[in-house]
Amino acid sequence: MSKSDLNLLVENIKFEHLNVFYDFVVSVLNALSISDFELSVILCDNAYIQELNNKFRNKNEPTDVLSFNYNEHNELNEDLVDGINYKIQGDLVISFEYLKFSAQEFNVEIYEELQRVTIHGILHLMGYKHETNDFQKEGMLILQENILKENKRVF
C-alpha cells in the first residue's frame, strides 16, 4: 500500500508561494516514480540550517540544502532506475536565505535555484550520490537538470 505524505514548513522566513511549491514537489516525485513517500520540506533562514549543519555534519556554516533520510537502507541501483517505484522517508531543509546568494552567484532566478536544490535533495533521499559538481559528467546532476527542465514552475 502506498503512502503519500508531503508537508511543507516555513521557519524564520516569509514565503508566499507554498501552493506552487507544493505542486512542484509533487510533480518531481511523480517524474521520479515515487508514489510511496513521507517527506517534509522545511524552508528556513541561514541561522536555522547552520545549527542543523553544525549538529549533524560538524560544519558550523550555512548551506543550501540538507537531506535527512529516515529510510537509510535506500541503495540506488542506477541500472534499475526505469520502472521502479521508490519509497522515500525523510526531511529536506532548504535555506531560502542562502539561495539568494547562490542564485546571484549562478546568475539564475531564486525560484529556479529553489527548484534545483529541492530536486537535488530528493535525489539524495533516493540514494543518488555525486563526487563532483560537474553538471556535464555527474549522472545525478544531469538527471537533476533534466527533471528541472521538465517540471519547472513559475512562481
Swiss-Prot record:
Entry GO CC: cytoplasm
GO biological process, one term: rRNA processing
Keyword Zinc: yes
Function: Single strand-specific metallo-endoribonuclease involved in late-stage 70S ribosome quality control and in maturation of the 3' terminus of the 16S rRNA.
Subcellular localization: Cytoplasm
Pfam families (alphabetical): YbeY
Cofactor detail note: Binds 1 zinc ion.
Chief place of localization: cytoplasm
Source species: Borreliella burgdorferi (strain ATCC 35210 / DSM 4680 / CIP 102532 / B31)
The protein's name in its UniProt record: Endoribonuclease YbeY
EC number, as in UniProt: 3.1.-.-
Domain of life: Bacteria
